[in-house]
Amino acid sequence: DVASREAQSIRPVPRPTAGEENRNYRFNWDSPFAISHHDPATIYLGGNHLMRSRDRGTTWEEASPDLTKMIDRDTVSIMGRLVTDETLSRHDGISSYGNITALAESKHSPDVLYVGTDDGNLQVTRDQGVTWTNVIDQVSGVPPRTYVSRIETSYEVDGRVYATFDGHRNDDYSPYTFVSNDFGSTWRTITNGLPEGWSVNVIREHPENSSLLFLGNEIGLYVSINAGGSWGRMQNNLPPVAVDDIAIHTRENDLVLGTHGRSIWILDDITPLQELSDQVLASAAHLFGS
C-alpha cells in the first residue's frame, strides 16, 4: 500500500509431507514471476516447482512437480574436482541449483504454460499443470544442462513460443535462440545476424506485429523485422552494455531496456519500427504513421 506503506511477504512456503517434514523450495537469485494474461489475480512464481496463486499471492499452490533434473550440486564437479566443506567460496553467488529461471503463459489460453530451468529442462503443459512434457530433446544443438534464459509466447500466433539459452557458465557463448510454432514439439534456430561469442539474455515479440522481435545479449540490442529471419544491431546512443530485460509499453508503444549496470533506457514510440518490413526497405519512399 503506497499510501500507508504497509507491505507483506507473499513468498510461498512448502507444507511438510510424510517423509519430507523439512521440505524447502529452491529459488533462483532472479526467480521469474508473471501475472496471468487472462486473470490479473493469478500470479506465477518459479522455484523448483511452478507456484501459482489465484488471489494475488495470499495463498499458493504447486502447479507442477519438481520440473528440474534434481541434481545435487555437491555432485557436480568444478574443473574436474568435486567441492568439499573446505572449498573456498563454495557455491559463491549461487543461491541454489535446480530451479526455474524462465516461465511464460500463453497469451491465447491459460491452460498453456512453459518453464525453463537452470539445469537445462524446457517443460510445457497444455492443461494448467496437470501434466508436463520436457521438450528439451527437440531443441537441436544446445548442450545438456544449458541455462534457459528466457521464454516468450506470441501475441498473434497460437502455439508460437521463443526460447533462449545462456551457456556462459560453461564457457559457451553461443547465441542460442529458437522458435517453435507447435507448442514446443519442434524447434528451429533463428540466429542469422546474431554475433557469435555473446550469449542471449532475453527475447520479446511486439504485441501488434509478430514479425518485429527484439533481443538482448551481452553487448546490446538486436532487432528483427522478419520474425527472426535475420537480425541487426540497434545502437544509436545506447552504449555497449548487457541487456538483461526488455519490455514494450503497450499504451505508449515505447521500448524499455533493463541493462546490467547502465540503468534503464527508453526508446520513445517505436511505431516506425512496427511498420518497417522488407517491402518498406525495398521501396523508394515510405510515409510512416505517427
What does each of the following model-derived ranges do?
Residues 1-290:
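Beta-propeller blade termini and top-face loops
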